[in-house]
A protein has these predicted regions:
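Short, glycine-anchored, charge-dense loop/turn motifs used at functional sites
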Residues: 11-17
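Single conserved hydrophobic/aromatic residue that forms the stacking wall/gate
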Residues: 1-9
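Zn2+-dependent cytidine deaminase-like catalytic core
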Residues: 18-138
Length: 138
Protein backbone atom coordinates (compact mmCIF):
# COMPACT_ATOMS: atom_id res chain seq x y z
CA UNK A 1 0.00 0.00 0.00
CA UNK A 2 1.54 3.25 -1.14
CA UNK A 3 -0.93 5.80 0.16
CA UNK A 4 -3.60 6.00 2.78
CA UNK A 5 -6.59 8.14 2.00
CA UNK A 6 -9.52 9.06 4.14
CA UNK A 7 -12.45 11.15 3.11
CA UNK A 8 -15.98 12.14 3.91
CA UNK A 9 -18.93 13.47 1.97
CA UNK A 10 -20.98 16.30 3.50
CA UNK A 11 -24.34 17.46 2.24
CA UNK A 12 -25.48 21.05 1.73
CA UNK A 13 -26.58 21.16 5.40
CA UNK A 14 -22.97 20.42 6.42
CA UNK A 15 -23.87 16.94 7.71
CA UNK A 16 -21.59 13.98 7.06
CA UNK A 17 -23.48 11.51 4.87
CA UNK A 18 -20.68 9.03 4.23
CA UNK A 19 -17.01 8.27 4.90
CA UNK A 20 -14.46 6.16 3.08
CA UNK A 21 -10.87 4.95 3.20
CA UNK A 22 -8.50 2.99 0.98
CA UNK A 23 -8.73 -0.68 1.81
CA UNK A 24 -9.28 -4.18 0.52
CA UNK A 25 -12.85 -5.32 -0.17
CA UNK A 26 -14.75 -6.69 2.82
CA UNK A 27 -13.38 -10.00 4.02
CA UNK A 28 -10.07 -9.68 2.16
CA UNK A 29 -6.71 -8.89 3.71
CA UNK A 30 -5.26 -5.39 3.29
CA UNK A 31 -1.84 -4.97 1.69
CA UNK A 32 -0.56 -3.28 4.86
CA UNK A 33 -1.60 -6.33 6.90
CA UNK A 34 -0.03 -8.70 4.35
CA UNK A 35 3.15 -6.62 4.31
CA UNK A 36 3.32 -6.45 0.53
CA UNK A 37 1.87 -4.64 -2.45
CA UNK A 38 1.59 -6.39 -5.82
CA UNK A 39 1.90 -3.11 -7.74
CA UNK A 40 5.12 -2.24 -5.90
CA UNK A 41 6.49 -5.74 -6.52
CA UNK A 42 5.66 -5.42 -10.24
CA UNK A 43 7.36 -1.98 -10.25
CA UNK A 44 4.24 -0.26 -11.55
CA UNK A 45 4.60 3.53 -11.29
CA UNK A 46 2.26 5.39 -8.98
CA UNK A 47 -0.88 6.52 -10.79
CA UNK A 48 -0.91 3.64 -13.29
CA UNK A 49 -2.67 0.26 -13.62
CA UNK A 50 -5.12 0.73 -10.75
CA UNK A 51 -7.01 -2.34 -11.89
CA UNK A 52 -4.16 -4.40 -10.41
CA UNK A 53 -4.57 -2.79 -6.99
CA UNK A 54 -6.54 -4.87 -4.50
CA UNK A 55 -7.83 -1.88 -2.56
CA UNK A 56 -11.04 0.02 -3.08
CA UNK A 57 -10.29 3.74 -3.12
CA UNK A 58 -11.63 6.03 -0.39
CA UNK A 59 -13.88 7.91 -2.82
CA UNK A 60 -15.45 4.68 -4.11
CA UNK A 61 -15.99 3.31 -0.59
CA UNK A 62 -17.79 6.50 0.45
CA UNK A 63 -19.90 6.67 -2.71
CA UNK A 64 -20.92 3.01 -2.35
CA UNK A 65 -22.17 3.73 1.17
CA UNK A 66 -24.28 6.80 0.35
CA UNK A 67 -27.47 7.40 -1.59
CA UNK A 68 -27.12 9.47 -4.76
CA UNK A 69 -29.99 11.67 -3.62
CA UNK A 70 -27.93 12.69 -0.58
CA UNK A 71 -24.76 13.26 -2.62
CA UNK A 72 -26.24 15.66 -5.20
CA UNK A 73 -24.67 19.06 -4.55
CA UNK A 74 -22.46 17.69 -1.76
CA UNK A 75 -18.80 18.29 -0.95
CA UNK A 76 -16.17 15.56 -0.75
CA UNK A 77 -13.25 16.17 1.64
CA UNK A 78 -10.06 14.21 0.91
CA UNK A 79 -6.78 13.83 2.79
CA UNK A 80 -3.91 11.56 1.80
CA UNK A 81 -0.93 10.28 3.77
CA UNK A 82 2.10 8.21 2.83
CA UNK A 83 1.44 4.64 4.01
CA UNK A 84 4.96 4.18 5.41
CA UNK A 85 5.82 7.60 6.86
CA UNK A 86 2.25 8.80 7.52
CA UNK A 87 3.30 12.22 6.24
CA UNK A 88 0.61 14.36 4.65
CA UNK A 89 0.58 14.12 0.85
CA UNK A 90 0.78 17.63 -0.56
CA UNK A 91 -0.17 16.45 -4.06
CA UNK A 92 -3.15 14.22 -3.24
CA UNK A 93 -5.95 14.08 -5.81
CA UNK A 94 -8.56 11.65 -7.05
CA UNK A 95 -7.52 9.19 -9.77
CA UNK A 96 -9.36 9.22 -13.11
CA UNK A 97 -11.58 6.28 -12.12
CA UNK A 98 -12.62 7.98 -8.88
CA UNK A 99 -13.20 11.27 -10.71
CA UNK A 100 -15.74 9.54 -12.94
CA UNK A 101 -17.50 8.12 -9.88
CA UNK A 102 -17.52 11.53 -8.17
CA UNK A 103 -19.02 13.12 -11.30
CA UNK A 104 -21.76 10.47 -11.58
CA UNK A 105 -22.54 10.67 -7.85
CA UNK A 106 -23.55 14.32 -8.25
CA UNK A 107 -20.87 15.65 -5.90
CA UNK A 108 -20.37 19.37 -6.53
CA UNK A 109 -16.91 20.12 -5.12
CA UNK A 110 -13.86 18.32 -3.77
CA UNK A 111 -11.71 19.85 -1.05
CA UNK A 112 -8.27 18.26 -0.79
CA UNK A 113 -5.99 18.90 2.17
CA UNK A 114 -2.55 19.84 0.82
CA UNK A 115 -0.86 21.05 4.01
CA UNK A 116 -1.49 21.70 7.68
CA UNK A 117 -3.61 24.75 6.85
CA UNK A 118 -3.87 24.61 3.04
CA UNK A 119 -6.49 23.10 0.78
CA UNK A 120 -7.12 22.70 -2.94
CA UNK A 121 -10.78 23.30 -3.84
CA UNK A 122 -11.94 21.61 -7.04
CA UNK A 123 -15.21 22.40 -8.78
CA UNK A 124 -16.30 19.00 -10.14
CA UNK A 125 -17.62 20.74 -13.28
CA UNK A 126 -13.93 21.37 -14.10
CA UNK A 127 -13.37 17.59 -14.16
CA UNK A 128 -16.31 17.30 -16.55
CA UNK A 129 -14.98 20.06 -18.85
CA UNK A 130 -11.36 18.85 -18.73
CA UNK A 131 -12.13 15.23 -19.52
CA UNK A 132 -8.90 13.32 -18.82
CA UNK A 133 -10.39 10.18 -20.39
CA UNK A 134 -11.07 11.85 -23.78
CA UNK A 135 -7.48 11.75 -25.06
CA UNK A 136 -8.70 9.88 -28.14
CA UNK A 137 -11.34 12.49 -29.08
CA UNK A 138 -10.19 15.32 -31.35
Amino acid sequence: LRRQRQMCIRDSNDEIISTGYNGAPRGRINCTDAGRCARVEMKIPSGERYELCRSVHAEANAIISASRRDMIGSTLYLVGRDAQTHELLTNATSCSMCRRQVINAGIERVIIRTGDDTFNIVDVDEWVKNDDSAFWIE
